[in-house]
Amino acid sequence: MNMNEFKGVIEGLLFASGDEGVTAKQLSKILDIGLDTVEHILEELRFEYEREDRGLMIIQSNNIFHLATKPEHSSYFKRLIDSPRTSKMSQAALETLAIIAYRQPITRAEIDEIRGVRSERPVQTLITRNLIEETGRKDTVGRPVLFQTSKEFLTFFGLATLDDLPPLPENIDPDKEEREADLFFERFQDEV
């Protein structure tokens, strides 16, 4: 790969790492190139974002690099967040919501384990739509955030309490459990 290709991959990895970010050392290991080269590419990217009046910037905090939006554009991002939602919720968000509804309080790592994939974006979507909320921290190593459904979740789905959720049969295989949850949430997919 040439330097421009590495630059493109690093840019993509910064985007894919989301809020967690990525260290130069991780990038070096992933790309199998020297740390000095990675740091040089990161500086080039940072300079390009600043020089070209782009909407993004690279920030560094505690040796972790993040791709972020520029603060001077924040009024536009607020408008986007405040605008009425016309988009449907993704299948990943519906699966995540079902897991949280039936297993709450639950950490994102536990959700990831059940789904078999990372759930950072679906969790963020559900928080943005006020369907879930943070409820504290689990008393374990790292003290991860616990999530639960919100009052808006109950209102939206026409439930008085969580006890009104359709019961999941005992001794159900995981595939069938997912289908049962999908059936419940499927009728709301177009509305959410």
Curated annotation (Swiss-Prot):
Short name of one Pfam family: SMC_ScpB
Primary localization class, coarse: cytoplasm
Keyword entries, A-Z: Cell cycle, Cell division, Chromosome partition, Cytoplasm
Subcellular location: Cytoplasm
InterPro entries hit by this protein: ScpB_csome_segregation, WH-like_DNA-bd_sf, WH_DNA-bd_sf
Any one GO biological process: cell division
UniProt-listed SUPFAM superfamilies: Winged helix' DNA-binding domain
Family matches, as Gene3D superfamilies: Winged helix-like DNA-binding domain superfamily/Winged helix DNA-binding domain (1.10.10.10)
Gene Ontology, cellular component aspect: cytoplasm
Task of the protein: Participates in chromosomal partition during cell division. May act via the formation of a condensin-like complex containing Smc and ScpA that pull DNA away from mid-cell into both cell halves.
Subunit structure: Homodimer. Homodimerization may be required to stabilize the binding of ScpA to the Smc head domains. Component of a cohesin-like complex composed of ScpA, ScpB and the Smc homodimer, in which ScpA and ScpB bind to the head domain of Smc. The presence of the three proteins is required for the association of the complex with DNA.
Family: Belongs to the ScpB family.
The name this protein goes by in its record: Segregation and condensation protein B
